[in-house]
Swiss-Prot record:
GO terms for cellular component: plasma membrane. One of its GO terms (molecular function) is zinc ion binding. Residues 166-178, 1207-1220, 1228-1240 have a biased composition (Basic residues). Keywords: Cell membrane, Developmental protein, LIM domain, Membrane, Metal-binding, Repeat, Zinc. This is Protein prickle. One of its GO terms (biological process) is anterior/posterior axis specification. The gene is pk. It comes from Drosophila pseudoobscura pseudoobscura (Fruit fly). It comes from the Eukaryota. It is a peripheral membrane protein. Residues 952-962, 1111-1120 have a biased composition (Polar residues). The lineage of its organism: Eukaryota, Metazoa, Ecdysozoa, Arthropoda, Hexapoda. SUPFAM superfamilies: Glucocorticoid receptor-like (DNA-binding domain).
Length: 1353
């Protein structure tokens, strides 16, 4: 269009030439960019459209062929490009001169082709010298006022590599200026007239050039190109008019330079044709006469040369070349369609293989040929028609580039604003033009995406546009003022261009010039850049609003650019509005918008669904001659017999979808596949491969037996595909394994390539591995010995941990007894055979010997290994330490504990020190640390541990270890438990005696009241279960009360500790009430830890804990005292261990060792813990009921155990184990029942059988609840929960219970299913965890008691 000529001010022409020539025009553009830019900008806009159309076709071909796209394009266009470049160089030179002169050369800008070779070079040079966006501004300058703006714009290189769009625009403008040099508008008013003339002349020339495949490379459809071409047709005249108008506007805003006037004058002649050109946007190349000239030249679609391709590569981001700007097809006629004939030609030129596939696809092939023909595909309503003015109302929907006017699906194009944003629409010329217009994108038709790349997110363009003027250049820039516009169009440069064009509409004259040449109009847009520079703000606002709307509402039938430029591919033969309707029925993430995930998806699917090696021998490896022939035959036959391409049409009448059987409504878009029948139709989203259910890329399908396949899966229905090389297996022999096939020599280790034929291998993720590589890459390491577990070795796995399936590795961490085929208790990263072992009290050291054992604490070293497994209470929450670390840790812990215990024994009355020693008695150094924390906490009056800032936090964290948890109540008791643990077995009677002895010493610690409450509870419980302790209970309670009295928080922590310890089965730290016990050095800490749970304090634990709470709160104490007996009794029963300690078997709940019932009830009671504390009675009862049910399940075992527990005859060892288990379970239950009391209860319950727990839990819960309620329930509950959590970790047995952080979790964990999940069921000697889980689950359901109880005795 004469828009280039319009900016002939030397610059205009030069600019146009500059892109192509890369000569002084670029420099001139830099210098006189303002003037030339306007023109140049206008011209390039046209080219991109045509180019885009061609590019779309070529793109399709390339994609279909699966060949190297660039290579394919080079093949297709190298020759044409060379010719075009030669012609373009000449024309560009002329155009540049004409542009500089401001003469009619502008009219010849249409011979964008001239710029192809030189044009590209010029674009590059121009980009280097001056930003094209700026140049565009210059082009506007010739219009008049544009010069200042252009100059400002020129400040930044229009086509720098970073902002290639501008350079592209320059090139287009220069080319157009060449072609249209004559038609360049002398004046804005005159320009309107000349536009038509220059448009027609130059449009023809440029149309040929536009046919160049930049747009095609961009993936722009032929339709878009056609629209561009049409735009060119119109652009000379209309461009001139538009330019003239634009210039007028700019002149109004800025001075009109002599060059501008000259340009306008030159364009004045063509302006008459331009008017028709604008209408052609409607589908008529009104500047047809000029366009024909242009078309004639464009008709020669020369393949791009390597140089062209290089330039294109650079230009891909600078799509400003006016390729195929021929107005062959009316913009309306030009719809993104691929002509099969064209296809074949193009396909052949591009890549034979690709062409074949394209040909089969038919439509795809058409794309390439269309480009070659370029007349039709490229032809498009000139951008001038599209002139942004349309947005403005000036341009008719012809404004193909924008396509918005036509109400095309260009709304994305409206993203034209986006183009201002610098959003490129790689497939649509309008996008290119928009970018060019915006001065953002290069003129080259390369995908706007790439332009964007150069101009980061379209914004590079925008930044210049950001400046009012810059925006003005490409009304995408103009959008700058209407910022909204840019963002909206950011999706597609085409939209941007449309927007820019529409912005130009503001400058109707100028814009029209630029606009008419989508080839040229875009340049007008560029011109508008400069002009807009002056009036950018005006344009931008206009552009932002109306333009955006125009693009969105593009009404031009032929202007697929507006609607289509935002897509990298569109179904052939559709109008923009139909294209939008089509894509509206496809998932957004699969719509191939430019630079979107949908575009990436399409590219991936092209390669996946149409594998190049299925069609072309050159893509295959190691084929024999026979196989090569067979592949050719195979490919040819497939294409002949099965290949087809869907035809998209708008239904005139409703019909059912062959995919989903639902009705496709009248007026909806449907896809037809003629190979499957003339009436076979699908929803766009239902047109998928029957195997992979993915959308058939570019509607290319293969049919067989009435079903549609993608290329890949159709080939696999005929021949096997090698899983290694992904090629079709044409050989007579192949290896098949696990439903897959391999070439004989391809079935090898995925890692070392060792042939696996006839050898053992392991499949992982569909890839075979030799045993050696598999072990090296995927073998798990044994948690015990640290050695890799080979594929030939048995492996036990649980919760991310792995062991050799040997007696040595998969064994109890404490007593080292084999756990193969047995239930085990996972805790703190280690596995145990029982709760006692998990607490560091080896059950093996005769429980009956408990007294002696606990009396003489085992040396730390003795307990080191078990404790090693059981990390400190902290360890319970933390991953298990390595055995050595654990041993070391435990050794230090034991030593510390031993010392603490000794100190405690010496200073039995010293609650704090005792508490400390007890804390250490937990299990390992971690516990010792916890104890230390407890000590400091206790001394401070806070919890034993830091966690018990209130005497509870640390306890909670340490609760994990039996001692530490109880240590909360101050490790006083903990040292004993430590000793108990060391002894591993102790006489509960002795323990009770010791406790009694110790308790009296402890009274100093506790408040008498709390102690009494505890004592009463203990006495009641103890009386029933542990008379000994009952007697001494008061002292312990006093001590505890004193201790608690010292620190209510401490009481909480103590209670927490007690509960935890009870849970841990390391009663070592009874509750803080036990602090007294802690004082009692007599009770061996280890035993205490075992019996601690059962200790009166522990029993008091429920009571005691309650007592501790009571000591904290007298009401609680009273309440505990009131309910204490019941709960304590339950606890005592539950604290069978305590009972054993007291020597009484009276605990009906005594030692319920049933893992399942106890565990489940425990978990329930534990979960109900907090609740129990607050409403414990009901919750406890419910939990008790659940326990009862569980018990009923496990009744046999439980009752037996319970009777044993109840029976005084139980050996302390048995009792202790049971107590440990049951105490843990019952303790957990109680804890779940009530927060604080649950701690003491936890211990007592731990010893008590599940049923007793239920009873005790129910009974005590009320008491405990009352206590906890009386005393701050929430704090207690929280503390108890914390303790319980730690205790859970310590106490929980995979079979008996799970160690979860909350009482509810405990309950849940204790439930059969949960325990199974936790590993509560014994891990069977099965390589598959799932099998083991199932086995565990069945026994749990059947006789969960046995399985879940980690049967210890």
């Amino acid at each position: 269009m004469s828009s280039l000529s319009a900016p002939p001010g030397g610059c205009g022409g030069d600019v146009a030439a500059a892109p192509a020539t890369a000569t002084s025009t670029a420099t001139a553009t830099a210098t006189a960019t303002a003037t030339a830019t306007a023109t140049g900008s206008m011209e390039p806009a046209m080219v991109p459209r045509t180019a885009n159309l061609l590019a779309c076709k070529q793109w399709w071909r390339v994609c279909f062929l699966y060949g190297d796209q660039q290579k394919y394009y080079r093949q297709l266009y190298s020759k044409a490009a060379a010719q075009r470049l030669a012609g373009a160089n000449q024309e560009n030179d002329n155009a540049a001169r004409g542009a500089g002169a401001g003469e009619g050369e502008g009219q010849e800008y249409d011979t964008v082709a001239m710029g192809d070779g030189d044009f590209i070079a010029a674009q590059l040079d121009a980009g280097e010298d001056v930003d094209d966006g700026i140049d565009l501004g210059d082009s506007s300058q010739p219009g008049g006022g544009a010069t200042p703006t252009a100059t400002a714009t020129a400040g930044r290189p229009l086509f720098p590599l970073s902002s290639s769009p501008r350079r592209s625009k320059k090139l287009l403008r220069s080319l157009r200026a060449h072609v249209k040099g004559e038609s360049r508008p002398e004046k804005p008013a005159k320009a309107a007239k000349p536009q038509s003339e220059p448009s027609s002349e130059l449009t023809k020339r440029n149309a040929r050039v536009t046919v160049l495949d930049d747009p095609f490379l961009f993936g722009i459809d032929a339709d878009h190109l056609g629209d561009l071409v049409r735009g060119k047709q119109y652009s000379p005249l209309e461009a001139t008019e538009n330019i003239a108008k634009f210039y007028e506007l700019q002149l109004e805003t800025t001075e009109a330079t002599a060059q501008v006037l000259e340009i306008i004058e030159q364009e004045e002649e063509p302006p008459e044709p331009p008017k028709p050109a604008l209408p052609p946007k409607q589908k008529q190349p009104r500047p047809v006469p000029p366009l024909p000239a242009r078309i004639t030249q464009p008709a020669v679609l020369q393949p791009l040369t390597a140089g062209d391709l290089q330039f294109l590569n650079l230009s891909l981001r600078h799509r400003s070349l006016p390729r195929s700007m021929k107005p062959f097809k009316d913009p309306h006629d030009i719809s993104f369609t691929f002509n099969e004939l064209d296809t074949s030609t193009s396909a052949t030129a591009a890549a034979a293989a690709a062409a074949v596939a394209a040909a089969d696809v038919a439509t795809g092939v058409g794309v390439g040929s269309s480009q070659q023909e370029s007349n039709e595909p490229i032809s498009r309503t000139p951008l001038t028609q599209i002139s942004y003015l349309q947005k403005i109302p000036t341009l008719p929907r012809h404004f193909s580039p924008s396509g918005c006017p036509q109400g095309l699906p260009p709304p994305p194009a409206l993203a034209g604003c986006g183009s201002a944003l610098g959003l490129p629409s790689s497939s649509s010329a309008s996008a290119l033009y928009a970018a060019q217009n915006g001065g953002m994108l290069p003129t080259s038709p390369l995908p706007l995406q790439r332009h964007q790349q150069y101009l980061p997110p379209h914004h590079q363009q925008l930044p210049p546009l950001g400046a009012g003027p810059g925006q003005g250049q490409g009304h995408g820039l103009a959008l700058g003022p209407g910022g909204a516009g840019l963002p909206q169009y950011s999706p597609a440069v085409s939209g941007c261009s449309s927007t820019a064009k529409y912005s130009n509409a503001q400058l109707p004259p100028h814009h029209h010039q630029l606009s008419p040449a989508l080839s040229t109009p875009s340049p007008p847009s560029l011109l508008h850049h400069p002009a807009a520079g002056t009036s950018a703000s005006a344009h931008a606002p206009f552009l932002a609003g109306p333009h955006m709307d125009m693009q969105r509402q593009s009404h031009s039938d032929d202007d697929s650019g507006c609607a289509l430029e935002e897509y990298t591919w569109v179904p052939p033969g559709l109008r923009p509005d139909q294209v939008r309707l089509y894509f509206s029925q496809i998932p957004d993430d699969k719509v191939p918008y430019v630079n979107s995930p949908g575009e990436q998806y399409r590219v991936r699917q092209l390669l996946h669904q149409l594998p190049p090696h299925d069609n072309e021998v050159r893509y295959c490896h190691s084929l024999t001659d026979e196989e090569r022939k067979e592949l050719r035959l195979f490919s040819t036959q497939r294409k002949r017999d099965a290949l087809g391409r869907g035809n998209v049409r708008q239904l005139m009448s409703a019909r059912p979808c062959d995919g989903c059987d639902e009705l496709i409504s009248t007026g909806d878009i449907a896809v037809f596949a003629t190979r499957l029948g003339p009436n076979a139709s699908w929803h766009p989203a239902c047109f998928t491969c029957c195997i992979c259910r993915e959308l058939l890329v570019d509607l290319i399908y293969f049919h067989r037996d009435g079903r549609m396949y993608c290329g890949r899966h159709h080939a696999e229905t005929l021949k096997p595909r090698c899983s290694a090389c992904d090629e079709i297996i044409l050989a007579d022999e192949c290896t098949e394994a696990e439903g897959r096939a391999w070439h004989m020599n391809h079935f090898a280790c995925h890692e070392c390539d060792k042939q696996l034929g006839g050898q053992r291998y392991i499949m992982r993720e569909g890839k075979p591995y030799c045993l050696h590589c598999f072990d090296a890459m995927f073998a798990e390491y044994c948690d015990y010995c640290g050695e890799a577990i080979g594929v030939d070795q048995g492996q036990m796995s649980h919760d991310g941990q792995h062991w050799h399936a040997t007696d040595e590795c998969f064994s109890c961490n404490t007593c080292r007894c084999s756990l193969l085929g047995r239930a085990f208790l996972p805790r703190r990263g280690a596995i145990y055979c029982s709760i006692a072992c998990s607490k560091g009290e080896p059950p093996t050291p005769s429980d009956s010997s408990g007294t002696g054992m606990y009396t003489t604490p085992t040396p730390p070293t003795q307990r080191v290994r078990p404790q090693t497994r059981i990390t400190s209470s902290h360890a319970s929450s933390s991953p298990p330490m390595s055995p050595q670390q654990q041993q070391q840790h435990q050794a230090s812990f034991n030593q510390a504990m031993y010392q603490l215990q000794t100190q405690q024994l010496e200073a039995a009355g010293g609650p704090v020190s005792q508490s400390q020693s007890y804390a250490t008695s937990d299990s390992d150094a971690g516990v010792v640390k916890d104890l230390e924390h407890c000590r400091s906490g206790d001394h401070a009056g806070g919890g034993d541990f830091t966690d018990f800032s209130g005497g509870r936090a640390s306890s909670t964290s340490h609760n994990m270890s039996p001692l530490n948890s109880p240590g909360d109540f101050q490790p006083h008791l903990m040292p004993k438990p430590m000793e108990l643990q060391r002894d591993g077995v102790y006489n509960f009677n002795e323990m009770s005696s010791n406790l009694d002895t110790a308790w009296p010493a402890k009274p100093p610690l506790g408040a008498t009241h709390s102690y009494q409450l505890q004592r009463q509870l203990m006495e009641n419980q103890h009386t029933s279960s542990m008379p000994e302790l009952a007697g001494k209970g008061p002292m312990l309670q006093h001590q505890m009360a004193a201790h608690f009295g010292q620190q209510p928080a401490l009481h909480s922590s103590a209670q927490q500790f007690q509960h935890e310890y009870a849970d841990i089965m390391h009663p070592p730290p009874p509750p803080p009430e036990r602090g007294a016990v802690g004082e009692v050095p007599e009770l061996p800490t280890p035993n205490l830890s075992v019996a601690s749970t059962a200790l009166p304090p522990e029993l008091m634990g429920s009571p005691t804990h309650s007592a501790g709470d009571r000591s904290l709160n007298t009401p609680l104490s009273a309440h505990s005292a009131t309910h204490g007996p019941t709960h304590p009794v339950s606890i005592l029963s539950g604290a069978s261990s305590s009972s054993p300690m007291s020597g009484e078997p009276a605990k009906k709940k005594g030692v319920r060792f049933e893992g399942i019932p106890d565990t489940l009830p425990r978990s329930r009671s534990y979960s109900g813990n907090g609740a129990g504390t607050s409403g414990g009675g009901d919750k406890d009862r419910d939990r008790d009921r659940e326990r009862d049910r569980d018990r009923d399940r496990d009744k046999g075992g439980d009752k037996d155990r319970e009777s044993g527990r109840h029976g005084p005859g139980h050996s302390s060892r048995r009792r202790r184990r049971r107590k440990s288990t049951s105490s843990t379970s019952s303790g957990n239950h109680h804890r779940s029942g009530s927060g604080h009391r649950s701690h003491s209860t936890t211990r007592a319950d731990t010893y008590a059988p599940a049923q007793p727990l239920s009873s005790s839990y129910q009974g005590p819960p009320s008491v405990l609840q009352a206590d906890s309620e009386t005393a701050h329930k929430s704090p207690r509950q929280q503390r108890e929960r914390e303790r319980e959590e730690s205790a859970e970790e310590s106490d929980v047995c995979s079979t008996c219970s799970s160690s979860s952080s909350s009482s509810e979790d405990y309950m849940m964990m204790y439930q059969l299913p949960q325990r199974r999940h936790y590993g509560g069921v014994r891990v069977s000697y099965v390589p598959n965890d799932a099998l083991a889980y199932d086995r565990k689950r069945k026994p749990a359901e059947m006789a969960g008691d046995k399985d879940k109880n980690c049967i210890i005795s």
